[in-house]
Design a protein with these regions (language model features):
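Short beta-strand/loop motif that positions the catalytic acidic residue
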Residues: 154, 160-162
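Acidic catalytic loop of the alpha/beta-hydrolase fold
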Residues: 118, 135-139, 164-169
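Short glycine-enriched nucleophile-adjacent loop
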Residues: 3-14, 20
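Short alpha-helix in the alpha/beta-hydrolase fold that links the catalytic acid
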Residues: 143-148, 170-181
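Active-site nucleophile elbow and catalytic-triad environment of alpha/beta-hydrolase enzymes
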Residues: 114-115, 130-150
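Catalytic active-site module of serine/aspartate enzymes centered on a nucleophile-bearing elbow/loop
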Residues: 175-216
Length: 216
């Protein structure tokens, strides 16, 4: 969302944006991303505690929000990163009947459940619904079907950074933005960093990313 806001500010307020850096973003969500977001929304809406969004304070649809966050968190990672961190490591090495219960068995299950439960304590379900829908509806292509019409308003120099393992916002989507800016004669640069943390790569304290931002 931050990268999308950055681009929108550069378009809507060209006289107020001196320069910008957009990390791991896109001009609009593709079908797969919308599908993930809607599945998360359905987890919330299907929770009996949602009550059409009119749940009382302190009694939000915690289970639905937790599941939505678990699934979304998977999209922030990468297959390589998850395999390196978790693989098939188990929390419990005691032999058990395979279908006697569905408690946490693998480390990755424990990690995702923790992420979901922790999210519930600091985030609101209705807010999650609104934010994911806003992300899905964001579209720089607009009704004309091209980026050029929107990006021709940009007057400031910009840097767009993509990450090789980001499958939520793949590098090609970042490149498309810069290619459109260059077609319009704008001052734009693109850098693609090879990192295995998926979309979350932009959150890591990477010396390469820090050096890139500082130099820009």
């Amino acid at each position: 969302m931050g990268g999308m806001q950055t681009l929108q500010w550069a378009i809507a307020h060209p006289d107020r944006v001196g320069s910008y850096i957009a990390l791991a973003c896109c001009a609009r969500h593709q079908a797969q991303t919308i599908a993930f977001n809607d599945t998360g929304r359905q987890a919330i809406i299907s929770d009996p505690s949602w009550l059409q969004g009119h749940y009382p304070d302190g009694k939000q649809p915690a289970q639905g929000l937790s599941v939505a966050r678990m699934m979304a968190h998977i999209t922030y990672l990468s297959e390589t990163g998850m395999e390196a961190k978790f693989g098939r490591k188990r929390r419990d090495t005691v032999a058990r009947e395979p279908f006697e219960n569905y408690d946490v068995e693998f480390e990755v299950e424990s990690y995702l459940r923790h992420q979901g439960q922790a999210f519930v304590s600091r985030f609101d379900a209705n807010t999650y619904l609104c934010l994911t829908k806003a992300l899905d509806r964001f579209d720089l292509y607009g009704t004309l079907g091209t980026l050029d019409e929107a990006l021709h308003h940009v007057n400031s120099p910009g840097l767009v950074v993509g990450f090789t393992s980001d499958w939520l916002y793949p590098p090609q989507g970042n490149r498309d933005i810069v290619e459109a800016l260059l077609r319009l004669g704008k001052d734009a640069s693109y850098v693609e960093l090879e990192m295995d943390a998926g979309h979350d790569s932009f959150l890591l304290c990477s010396p390469r990313l820090e050096a890139l931002i500082r130099s820009y």
